């Protein structure tokens, strides 16, 4: 039994037929076109805004506000040890991480976390390093230079 081009057809359910709304009773979507009868949702350009509950006090206003977003967290990037293998050279700083496209250019701080293997001895300057990552770095022969605000 060979495969013939003239016998090819798409699988069952692969092609759906288009719904032609408002084109007669037989289509199943005639007259009101699946919109029901009257009301705001049946009109063209209709719809209520997101979260609107018909005039009732909406959930997002019933629930109290809480917390805040730390701006420090928004400008601090987490870097895995395994990602450091992309860096040319032996010094790791925020600038070298940006140059190697490991962190975004709008990041001001970096934090090295223990995830993956480190294969080379690096010197870390001006970045935070977790305890586990520091142990792995020193085991690989690297050093971590502690500056103001980078100790964990």
Curated annotation (Swiss-Prot):
Coiled coil: none
Region (Disordered): 1-54
Keywords: Ribonucleoprotein, Ribosomal protein, RNA-binding, rRNA-binding
InterPro entries, alphabetized: Ribosomal_uL15, Ribosomal_uL15/eL18, Ribosomal_uL15/eL18_sf, Ribosomal_uL15_bac-type
An annotated Gene Ontology molecular function: rRNA binding
Chain intervals with Gly residues compositional bias: 24-37
Cystine bridges: none
A Pfam family reported for this protein in Swiss-Prot or TrEMBL: Ribosomal_L27A
Gene Ontology CC terms: cytosolic large ribosomal subunit
UniProt keyword annotation of rRNA-binding present: yes
Record-level GO BP terms: translation
Keyword rRNA-binding on entry: yes
Function: Binds to the 23S rRNA.
Quaternary organization: Part of the 50S ribosomal subunit.
PANTHER family hit by this protein: 50S RIBOSOMAL PROTEIN L15 (PTHR12934), LARGE RIBOSOMAL SUBUNIT PROTEIN UL15M (PTHR12934:SF11)
NCBIfam families documented for this protein: rplO_bact
Annotated family: Belongs to the universal ribosomal protein uL15 family.
Name used for this protein in its record: Large ribosomal subunit protein uL15
